[in-house]
């Protein structure tokens, strides 16, 4: 089965960058043709387009992105400060992003002058990241941290701080940082404040088709889903007999071991694995007026969920 490799993902990002450049060039040419008679306006439009071309390309598009006129270049050594509530998966994701960007991760307790520092925290913790955001930013989104998977990302003066509603929300902020760092080749990063949240609580994909798919391919898609802030993989494979015709039988240990691997991948990527029941099998040939028969099937179903 097809697996999305890291190399293919990088190739896709390069093609996406080329497409963005071509799109920008065509847009500039079109604007120029439209405004040639208005000579006094040419300089203004060129300046606006240039600013737009330097904007970060982040998907899904954040709710609020505000730039200032400053920029900075990340140092070769990047100091990371993790608040106590930041889990290992979130820490690992940041370290992966920094390493892929060609920088060296250094664990620190404080902001380090002269080198880049990245702070990760949780709203209301009063930790390093939370305190920095409270002191150095003004949140513009009403009730930001009452919203689903909300976070704020501030990048300025060699300090990047990401504070989320919880550790998973901070994780999604790192996905935004990853896209910022891969937007363009210029090493200079524009100073920015991003405020974002999800309009949908559950975001992801359902495996419910009748084609064959192996566990390696499932894991590959879960890791890809991480980068675009998906948070659920609902398993409903119609080629799995223990999901369909054998719904009342327990999975053999070999299959449980594979499922456990996907559960672990879900914890690493925040794209959580969710097994779903094929409920039509439960009701096939069942007399719902027979309480004993119903309870017998119900207990079988519970036993399967408890595996």
Segments predicted by a language model, with ranges:
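Short, Lys/Arg-enriched N-terminal segments with co-localized hydrophobic residues
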Residues: 1-12
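A short, sequence-level motif marking secondary-structure junctions
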Residues: 2, 26-30, 167-168, 178
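Generic early N-terminus positional signal peaking at residue ~5-7
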Residues: 6, 17-19, 31
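Intrinsically disordered, low-complexity segments of exported/surface proteins
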Residues: 8-10, 17, 43-44
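Bacterial Sec-dependent N-terminal signal peptides
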Residues: 14-25
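Sec-dependent N-terminal signal peptides of Gram-positive bacterial secreted proteins and lipoproteins
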Residues: 23-43
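Acidic, contiguous N-terminal accessory segments
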Residues: 41-168, 176-195
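Feature activates predominantly on carbohydrate-active enzymes
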Residues: 139, 144-307
């Amino acid at each position: 089965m097809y697996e999305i490799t890291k190399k293919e993902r990088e190739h896709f990002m390069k093609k996406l960058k080329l497409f963005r450049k071509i799109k920008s060039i065509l847009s500039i040419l079109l604007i120029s043709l439209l405004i040639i008679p208005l000579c006094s306006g040419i300089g203004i439009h060129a300046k606006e387009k240039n600013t737009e071309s330097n904007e970060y390309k982040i998907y899904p598009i954040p709710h609020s992105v505000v730039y200032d006129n400053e920029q900075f270049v990340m140092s070769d050594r990047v100091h990371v400060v993790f608040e106590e509530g930041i889990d290992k998966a979130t820490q690992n994701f940041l370290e992966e992003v920094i390493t892929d960007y060609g920088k060296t991760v250094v664990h620190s307790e404080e902001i380090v002058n002269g080198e880049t520092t990245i702070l990760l925290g949780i709203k209301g913790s009063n930790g390093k990241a939370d305190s920095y955001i409270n002191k150095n930013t003004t949140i513009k989104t009403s009730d930001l941290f009452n919203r689903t998977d909300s976070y704020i990302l501030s990048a300025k003066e060699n300090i990047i701080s990401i504070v989320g509603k919880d550790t998973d929300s901070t994780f999604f902020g790192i996905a935004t940082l990853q896209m910022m760092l891969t937007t363009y080749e210029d090493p200079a990063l524009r100073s920015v404040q991003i405020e974002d949240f999800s309009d949908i609580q559950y975001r992801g994909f359902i495996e419910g088709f009748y084609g064959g798919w192996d566990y390696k391919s499932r894991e590959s898609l879960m890791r890809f889903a991480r980068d675009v802030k998906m948070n659920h993989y609902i398993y409903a494979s119609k080629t799995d007999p223990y999901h369909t015709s054998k719904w009342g039988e327990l999975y053999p240990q070999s299959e449980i071991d594979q499922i456990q691997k996907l559960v672990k991948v879900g914890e690493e990527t925040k794209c959580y694995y969710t097994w779903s029941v094929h409920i039509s099998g439960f009701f096939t040939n069942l007399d719902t007026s027979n309480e004993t028969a119903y309870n017998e099937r119900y207990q079988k179903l519970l036993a399967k969920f408890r595996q």
